């Protein structure tokens, strides 16, 4: 999206400072965090680093911070329940949702092929970006900075019960169903109820013309997400 390195870095640094109060000392870490392997591979002669190693580190930092949060927040929950909660919070689709909620997806550097194939919207890439950013933040400023950022962005959504709103279930369902080839996924309103100011929609999701699941929502978009979520649950996601 950004053709010039200076433009990409300047706008990213400005956003981080304005939106989150984060200022990186080691600019190279930030640049690496937002560089996908496809971009690095297309510029091999420049010896550009990609974000996979930072992703590995960020995953560990994320797991630790969320584990501590759950341990303190739910003193009476057994280990098994906390593990399930953590898995839901750090799942790929939710991390991709937080990446988009923060507007980070527009700054990732992708190879031309990856860009053309829709990589900027791919949950796998966006989830990896989130972890890579956390890894870079950890190396630059330590675990307290990672914890502060997550408490600012992720934890409030869990506390408010708005967590599902961050997860893009439609994208997750599409990627799940298209693993073995392209399929036709359609969403159709099959029922509307309630007064004009408080309507509720029933949405059907179908795959290649066959109904897979339905979902309810106070808007068509929310109903689509609910239908996709229900479909994923049926598929055992």
From Swiss-Prot:
E.C. number: 3.1.26.3
Residues in RNase III domain copies: 13-142
UniProt record, GO biological process: mRNA processing; regulation of gene expression; rRNA processing; tRNA processing
Keywords of the record: Cytoplasm, Endonuclease, Hydrolase, Magnesium, Metal-binding, mRNA processing, Nuclease, RNA-binding, rRNA processing, rRNA-binding, tRNA processing
Residues at the catalytic site: 59, 131
Binding site for Mg(2+): 55, 128, 131
GO molecular function: double-stranded RNA binding; metal ion binding; ribonuclease III activity; rRNA binding
GO CC entries: cytoplasm
Catalytic activity: Endonucleolytic cleavage to 5'-phosphomonoester
PROSITE patterns, A to Z: DS_RBD, RNASE_3_1, RNASE_3_2
Location relative to the cell: Cytoplasm
SUPFAM superfamilies, A to Z: dsRNA-binding domain-like (SSF54768), RNase III domain-like (SSF69065)
Nuclease in keyword set: yes
Family indicated by similarity: Belongs to the ribonuclease III family.
UniProt cross-references to HAMAP family, sorted A to Z: RNase_III
Its biological purpose: Digests double-stranded RNA. Involved in the processing of primary rRNA transcript to yield the immediate precursors to the large and small rRNAs (23S and 16S). Processes some mRNAs, and tRNAs when they are encoded in the rRNA operon. Processes pre-crRNA and tracrRNA of type II CRISPR loci if present in the organism.
Subunit structure and binding partners: Homodimer.
Name assigned to this protein: Ribonuclease 3
Organism: Streptococcus thermophilus (strain ATCC BAA-250 / LMG 18311)
Source taxonomy: Bacteria, Bacillati, Bacillota, Bacilli, Lactobacillales
């Amino acid at each position: 999206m950004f053709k010039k390195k200076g433009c990409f870095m300047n706008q990213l640094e400005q956003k981080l400072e304005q939106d989150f109060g984060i200022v990186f000392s080691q600019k190279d870490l930030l640049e690496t965090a937002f560089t996908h392997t496809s971009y690095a591979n297309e510029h091999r002669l420049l010896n550009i680093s990609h974000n996979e190693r930072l992703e590995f580190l960020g995953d560990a930092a994320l797991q630790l911070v969320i584990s501590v949060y759950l341990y303190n927040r739910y003193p009476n929950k057994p280990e098994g329940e906390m593990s399930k909660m953590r898995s839901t919070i750090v799942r790929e689709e939710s991390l991709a949702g937080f990446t988009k909620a923060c507007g980070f997806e527009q700054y990732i550097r992708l190879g031309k092929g990856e860009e053309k194939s829709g990589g900027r919207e791919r949950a796998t890439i966006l989830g990896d970006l989130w972890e890579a950013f956390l890894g870079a933040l950890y190396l630059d400023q330590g675990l307290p900075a990672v914890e502060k950022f997550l408490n600012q962005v992720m934890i409030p959504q869990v506390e408010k019960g708005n967590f599902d709103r961050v997860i893009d279930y439609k994208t997750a369902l599409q990627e799940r169903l298209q693993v073995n080839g392209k399929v036709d996924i359609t969403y159709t309103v099959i029922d509307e109820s309630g007064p004009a100011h408080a309507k509720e929609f029933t949405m059907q999701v179908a795959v290649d013309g066959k109904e897979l699941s339905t979902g309810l929502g106070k808007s068509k978009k929310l109903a689509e997400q609910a239908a996709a979520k229900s479909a994923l649950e049926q598929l055992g996601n």
